[in-house]
Amino acid sequence: MYRTMMAGKLHRATVTEANLNYVGSITIDEDLLDAVGMLANEKVQIVNNNNGARLETYIIPGKRGSGVICLNGAAARLVQEGDKVIIISYQMMSDQEAKSHQPKVAVLDDQNKIEQMLGQEPAHTIL
């Protein structure tokens, strides 16, 4: 049996832009993608901490070191600049792989710089 497991997460990313007239997707700083193992065109889930909205889209790599987190197309209707979002990628794996799998979690500061890297979900609240 295969399970869908969290592979990577950008926790508390700050939306830097919402571009309604761009072809759909999310643009993410390529340094952040590398840190959590996400790839261009990969499907991701986005959770908006400000309004509870959840959506799925795909990744477009953004300029390295820019801190860009830009929701494009229709997704721009579900966020505002400054909103805090969680961006999650998933991976299918066997039960055996899942037992030892360690997702990569990056906790971001207000400028979308990595504040902390976690090997798994913390058992405490991160503000």
From Swiss-Prot:
Its cofactor is pyruvate. It catalyses: L-aspartate + H(+) = beta-alanine + CO2. The active site is at S25, Y58. InterPro entries: Asp_de-COase-like_dom_sf, Asp_decarbox. GO terms for cellular component: cytosol. One of its GO terms (biological process) is alanine biosynthetic process. Substrate binds at T57, G73, A74, A75. Binds 1 pyruvoyl group covalently per subunit. The modification Pyruvic acid (Ser) is found at S25. One of its GO terms (molecular function) is aspartate 1-decarboxylase activity. Its main location: cytoplasm. The keyword Lyase applies. Keywords: Autocatalytic cleavage, Cytoplasm, Decarboxylase, Lyase, Pantothenate biosynthesis, Pyruvate, Schiff base, Zymogen. It comes from the Bacteria. Belongs to the PanD family. PANTHER family: ASPARTATE 1-DECARBOXYLASE. Catalyzes the pyruvoyl-dependent decarboxylation of aspartate to produce beta-alanine. This is Aspartate 1-decarboxylase. It comes from Bacillus velezensis (strain DSM 23117 / BGSC 10A6 / LMG 26770 / FZB42). The gene is panD.
